[in-house]
Amino acid sequence: MKILVYGAGVLGCNLARNLFHAGKDVTLLARGNWAEEIRKNGLRIKDQFSLRTSVSNIPVVPELAPNVRYDVIFVVLRYTQLDSALETLRANQTKNIVFVGNNVQARALAAALPEKNILFAFALSAGHREPDRVVSIDLKKITIGQLRGAVSNAELIGEIFGGTKYKVVYEPNMEDYLLCHAAFVMPAAFACYKTDGDLKKLRRNTVYLGRVIDANIEGYRAIRNAGHDILPKADADFESEKYRKTCLRFFKLMCATSLGKLCASDHAMNAIDEMSALNRDIKRFFDENGAAYPVWQALEAEAGRYLR
């Protein structure tokens, strides 16, 4: 398959590297000094928890020309950058487009490209980019699928990821999956902003972490009451004591180890515009559906000097 990864941040670079190492025909769209670095020295990715640095000589292009056709394009941009890519995608001949990352307006985005086969995905990798390399943790797991009611893309997904090391979770209702993901990550982002990016300040603050969970539950409740599914299904019983205990253990681990910086605060502190837009749009969803979310609003107020 001929694949383009449109965007060369942490997620895009990990995706391109993994597909490339599986023998896929992959091209990476990158620009500026970072593109030149990859051309000269290869795409270098350092695994946070090992001494290993992979080097991948992936072809790089600076733009997507209208007459160049790919079997699939993965658009790996920040939520705030997606609109700027729509005209380019619309003009290109490629039919299969996968938007990877945070998104609470999946249905509207798909409607903006009616001639395309639109999928959405979320990959479990995180980290940061340095001038000459990416430093990250990559769990090689991706959740991917289309909107509920759209034609199944299971066969296409199998073809894309066949032979790779990815654990692929096919999700035929990505709109609800991404709504739920936003309802989980935004309260965690509030915690990052409260601590100026140093989550270790909260490692013993069980009361605050409990409020983070309360805000997540408010978000899930609003999503469920609006007629959407809670996804992944493991979170469906989100009002149970078991769910609270599981979340508390997770957040304590994040705050006590380097996982918090790598998986949460690195991105939150470097993508304030994206987190602000995500917060704005999911609150609009809450308001349109008459939801109450007082704990969410209180945590937001405490993080207010960062959010725009």
Locations of regions flagged by a protein language model:
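Helix-loop-beta segment of a Rossmann-like dinucleotide-binding subdomain
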Residues: 133-143, 193-203, 258-269
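NAD(P)+-binding Rossmann beta1-loop-alpha1 motif at the extreme N-terminus of oxidoreductases
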Residues: 1-51
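N-terminal glycine-rich dinucleotide-binding loop that anchors FAD/FMN and/or NAD(P) in oxidoreductases
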Residues: 43-60, 185
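NAD(P)-dependent Rossmann-like dehydrogenase/reductase catalytic/cofactor-binding core
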Residues: 217-220, 224-308
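Rossmann-like NAD(P)(H) cofactor-binding subdomain of soluble oxidoreductases
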Residues: 52-135
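Hydrophobic anchor at the start of a short beta-strand
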Residues: 3, 25-26, 97, 118, ...
